[in-house]
UniProtKB/Swiss-Prot annotation:
The chain crosses the membrane at residues 8-28, 44-64, 78-98, 148-168, 184-204, 222-242, 307-327, 355-375. One of its GO terms (biological process) is L-aspartate transmembrane transport. Belongs to the dicarboxylate/amino acid:cation symporter (DAACS) (TC 2.A.23) family. It holds the Pfam family SDF. One of its GO terms (molecular function) is fumarate transmembrane transporter activity. It is found in: Cell inner membrane. The keyword Transmembrane applies. Responsible for the transport of dicarboxylates such as succinate, fumarate, and malate from the periplasm across the membrane. SUPFAM superfamilies: Proton glutamate symport protein. NCBIfam families: PRK01663.1, PRK13027.1. GO terms for cellular component: plasma membrane. This is C4-dicarboxylate transport protein. Keywords: Cell inner membrane, Cell membrane, Membrane, Symport, Transmembrane, Transmembrane helix, Transport. The gene is dctA.
Amino acid sequence: MKKPFYKVLYVQVIFAIVVGVILGHYYPSLAVDMKPLGDGFIKLIKMVIGPIIFCTVVTGIAGMQDMKKVGRVGGKALLYFEIVSTCALVLGLAATHILRPGVGFNIDPATLNGKEVASYAAKAHGQSSVDFLMHIIPNTMIDAFAQGEILQILLIALLFGSVLAHLGERGRVVTDFIDGITRVLFGIVHIVTKLAPIGAFGAMAFTIGKYGVGSLVPLLKLIGTFYLTSVVFVLVVLGAIARFTGFSIIRFVGYIKEELLIVLGTSSSEAALPQLMEKLEKAGCSRSVVGLVVPTGYSFNLDGTNIYMTMAVLFIAQATNIELTWMQQLTLLAVAMLTSKGASGVTGAGFITLAATLAVVPTIPLSGMVLILGIDRFMSECRALTNIVGNGVATVVVSAWEKELDRAKLRAALSGNGEAAAGEAARV
């Protein structure tokens, strides 16, 4: 029996976002006090992200007959990430050249106050590529879970799952136990997800109440350019990849609409990570591929962040009337391919990454970041939305490459017959 429309989660989230915007606009002081509602919801989701990634990856790897598959899946995923990330970086650069959102500002760099962005610049210089790689190794297993470090948890899960696969039947009891824990954790996620409208309301009310719609007006062209470019990336680049793989990007976006609305309301792609993993399994992707690709993608496949980086750098150059040579722009692309990974998992990662990228183009002052500091919060929603769609598509593609994509399940899920697919997935 079909639910009444007002009981459907995505309808509730849309309503909550609208109410949050209204409250933030008309009663900003009250709206700012709603921040704990959004923060609380994100914390509830984050408390199960680590255990879910661990259990999903462990059971997926433990069930593999060929351990070479782990390396093969990881290699294919990283290759895909690098190619698509490069496309996102180039598209951001091209769109800014064509639409020129920074032209006409005529800002003198000497008049900019860089104190507000100094902390981001310090963090950018504080973490090298070696530091990033060393950070993947946790001090202790417990510390990785306590800090919620996704890549550290992934490393532990890879080792744990590999040992269970090597033990075979002797490790079956442990594997079955972890599989049972996985079902319990997803049950918790289902309960917490019912609170998504409250979290979306609190986060959106706070954003509008604190920053105000008026703060958007001077930089509307940049915001519009970024949103338009992200839509083009999803529909054209990811759309072409999806069509080549055998599914529709429009239907895929419709399939994960609840997760996208949660991300829209909270500005956090992590808030929808557990639900995304579960839905990808129900759509026919193998558990082992989902467990490896999705968590890794959250650090290495940030398509929205990549578009933002090259666009923001070129916008600052245009606004301050600084001409970049083609060689400088190619250098910018090369460095951005590295920095977009190096600052992942750090608070304020988008701005830290931008600071690290600007550091290699000395003709553009770091203080120029202050031009977009005020609107960064409004652009973060689009970054997060693009990131989550990109990671979802990546998982389906790698599953198809591994010939572990159940296309019948995928067609059923994307055509709206998700109930049957979900029931079958639950039995498996």
